[in-house]
Amino acid sequence: MEKDDLTHFNDEKRAKMVDVTSKSETKRRAIARATIHMNEETLARILAGKIAKGDVLAVAQVAGIMAAKKTSELIPMCHPIMTTKADISFEDDGKTELTITSEVVTVGKTGVEMEALTAVTIAALTIYDMCKAMDKGMRIEKTYLVEKTGGKSGTFKAEA
């Protein structure tokens, strides 16, 4: 990509929000993933619902969904969008790793990649916040876009 291809800059080389007025509305979907590593006791207590602050996964799920809907308030050049679906799921390895996956969908003029990435990031931060008293060494890693569909650029799938 050439420097001139960057769309978030105006002629004065200052930031701008991209004009999507003439773009067609299409179904757009994005899936993102993040992993949080923790000690075995922390994961076991999360899964057993034994964290003093409450149901960690339920709170993280709601936080991730809320984050997807509020992305344009956090990321300056993101367009406000009408989210038609936001879902968060969790998968653990039974030891020290919890994987968070988000799926965000809209019918609109711009994609939802940032919404999906924001959702998993905030869900992971919520888990950290709720468990930091017992495990300050948790690590949030491997946050990435898994897949996106729709729009002019078509389908993207991350390499496995």
Curated annotation (Swiss-Prot):
Catalysed reaction, written as an equation: (8S)-3',8-cyclo-7,8-dihydroguanosine 5'-triphosphate = cyclic pyranopterin phosphate + diphosphate
Database matches in Gene3D superfamilies: Molybdopterin cofactor biosynthesis C (MoaC) domain (3.30.70.640)
EC numbers, comma separated: 4.6.1.17
GO biological processes: Mo-molybdopterin cofactor biosynthetic process
Residue runs in coiled coils: none
Cited InterPro entries: MoaC, MoaC_bact/euk, MoaC_sf, MoCo_biosynth_MoaA/MoaC, Mopterin_CF_biosynth-C_dom
Domain of life: Bacteria
Pfam families found in the cross-reference section: MoaC (PF01967)
HAMAP family with a match to the protein in the record: MoaC_B
Protein name: Cyclic pyranopterin monophosphate synthase
Organism: Listeria monocytogenes serotype 4a (strain HCC23)
